[in-house]
């Protein structure tokens, strides 16, 4: 769930990652690149006790995330490059091979998820699916929710919505 919006700086970011990887190696974990990619995500939720407040409206989820040693890591430069490559591929209409135009596509996201950047950018992603030929493209934004909509206190509602779409 969630839909990262296209970032016009993705090509420049990828070039920076590649240059940094030549100097540091592709397994290097760059604090600078992490800040460039995710640093602004928490801004709308300040003041916040965690740099990961952007993940969830539910403070218990954020506290558990902060406490989990497997969470909160910094991507390697290779990881950032892959993330940017995927974004550039997904948002390039030339790369889509339309085989099943009737396949339903449903976007769902928290309305306050910083990955979607803005509702307008989110709707551009929805529009791209129509542009490449999908005929049944719909979306739902969940009011007040952030990135991890399937872990919120109201998750049963979201799972019910998903179940209804699948039936």
Show which residues each predicted segment covers:
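Short beta-strand/loop motif that positions the catalytic acidic residue
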Residues: 107-109
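Non-catalytic cap/lid and distal C-terminal segments of serine-dependent acyl enzymes
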Residues: 1, 90-91, 161-163
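Alpha/beta-hydrolase-fold enzymes
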Residues: 1-70
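Conserved alpha/beta-hydrolase "acid-adjacent" motif
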Residues: 114-124
